[in-house]
């Protein structure tokens, strides 16, 4: 049996976090106040992540709610250790992000996923497998940085396709085609190599900037 951490949060960056899985029709729309138990380390990282996100999305209006499938869960793995969080949706005054809408809103999805990669060591998104279509799983089981693993490679392939016109298969395999496309993009951006989370974030030119949302240029 996984031991529930005593630590919990009900808001992040001053925004209420709601549990949206009590009823099927709540998903991505609304939720109930909830105590999200997790380690204090995870809470601290999530706090910084959402502060960063909301500072970059002033043009979206005031953030109103964060919707989640949960943090600590009584099961094996990072959730059972209180080190993982599932992000379903974020509501601002003028914009709504819902994880399940990735196929039709890739620009926004990838921008948020890029920021997740900047702050959290493991990010499992829509392309990872069908079980992750409806949420972004983030956890602190690994240090932040670039790794040639399927979850990071899938993000990389989607970003290269979406923002640089590549036609890579999003299969999570870091092969010759992906490496060639990556090197060409790094040359355009003036980045010698991808070794840090910041460099990984910069691959996506679709940026969440302070006060605006743009898909061109560098910050």
PLM features: residue spans?
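Extracytoplasmic low-complexity/disordered linkers and repeat tracts associated with LysM-containing
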Residues: 218-219
């Amino acid at each position: 049996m996984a031991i529930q951490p005593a630590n919990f949060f009900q808001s992040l960056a001053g925004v209420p976090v709601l549990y949206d899985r009590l009823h099927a029709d709540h998903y991505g729309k609304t939720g109930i106040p909830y105590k999200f138990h997790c380690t204090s380390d995870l809470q601290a990282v999530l706090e910084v992540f959402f502060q960063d996100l909301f500072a970059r999305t002033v043009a979206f209006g005031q953030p109103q709610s964060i919707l989640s499938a949960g943090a600590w869960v009584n099961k094996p793995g990072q959730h059972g250790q209180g080190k993982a969080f599932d992000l379903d949706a974020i509501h601002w005054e003028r914009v709504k992000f819902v994880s399940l809408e990735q196929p039709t809103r890739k620009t926004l999805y990838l921008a948020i996923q890029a920021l997740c990669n900047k702050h959290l060591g493991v990010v499992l998104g829509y392309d990872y497998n069908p079980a992750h279509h409806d949420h972004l799983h983030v956890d602190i089981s690994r240090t932040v940085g670039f790794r040639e693993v399927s979850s990071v490679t899938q993000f990389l392939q989607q970003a290269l396709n979406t923002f640089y016109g590549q036609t890579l298969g999003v299969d999570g395999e870091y092969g010759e085609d992906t490496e060639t496309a990556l090197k060409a993009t790094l040359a355009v951006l003036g980045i010698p190599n991808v070794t840090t989370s910041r460099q990984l974030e910069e691959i996506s030119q679709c940026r969440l900037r302070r006060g605006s949302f743009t898909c061109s240029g560098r910050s």
